[in-house]
């Protein structure tokens, strides 16, 4: 481990570089949400047209995670991030100029592809920093992502409240994110060693799951956790309003509680793992989320339901960062191909989960539909218990 002054400076710079990548990615993503109704109006779309355009983003996101492996092999995670974030910023700046369904869908696809590609690459970089300096930073860096997402959304909301035009605010905001982050992205470490061929360790202790089995379990963990997160963000306000009877203003508190809990636990996640071990943190976190969701479905009151969503966020917050960490270290070299698989499983959950809840709610009730995240947390808990510290 680097202990000299020079080594400590290198570690700090590498961590700042990776953190800047996560922050830029999240702020650009956060800028999008509040402006979507305006983008819809600018393009002259109805609700179904907007749904088609946003499907382009989802398809692009999954495509990006799948093409990440060859891209990182060819250019390295550092250059994928440094080149991808400015191009992603240009994509956001062009959104107000999209003149119809076809152009908007294509643009959303491109932005989604870059978002998925950069997501995998910057997580590879975070794994490289952990391995090189023997410091656990993955969970805290994901905590920064959560905070930056909120900042980006708040910045967009402030622009809307001030009556600024989307043609001015979105391009300028995206440009600021790109320019400011560029000053720190140059500190991204070279993670070329993370692109070597994967080598399974034949001398693992007996009883330890094989890397392939661990990878499958991590995909289940990511699928379940992302699925719950997607449902919490997109459906919790509707659940509190229709199933609990909250007024429209209070219904949004569920998303706030969930997001705050997730960010807080991510900043604590690395310390908790250092003290208790990753399997314990994963298992206790997912189990706590399961109990909280079960209580929310039983108790039909606002305050306990909001508190339950906060506990769900607290429990699941570190789970995905830790899954990415293990995926990056399942193979001796931290080979890139492990992370795209886990990321693809996760994003699939975030897309399928909300759709599944809507479908079941139409057939039965929203309360019954919320059995979906309950089952997902149970699956995540069981899968997390079978993993080991990398």
Task: Give the ranges of each region predicted by the language model.
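Helix-to-loop junctions at the C-terminal end of transmembrane segments
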Residues: 62-77, 160, 265-278, 361-362
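Helix-breaking motifs and short loop linkers at transmembrane-helix boundaries and internal kinks
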Residues: 44, 76, 97-102, 245, ...
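Intracellular juxtamembrane helix-capping segments at the cytosolic ends
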Residues: 117-132, 318-331
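Short amphipathic helix-loop junctions that connect adjacent transmembrane helices
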Residues: 33-48, 234-250
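Pair of pore-lining "gating" transmembrane helices in MFS-fold secondary transporters
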Residues: 7-37, 41, 109, 212-228, ...
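Helix-loop-helix hairpin linking two adjacent transmembrane segments in secondary transporters
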Residues: 103, 141-192
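Primarily marks hydrophobic transmembrane alpha-helices of the MFS/SLC 12-helix fold
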Residues: 78-81, 85, 282
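Interfacial helix-cap and linker-helix signal at transmembrane-aqueous boundaries
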Residues: 39-40, 71-72, 158-163, 240-241, ...
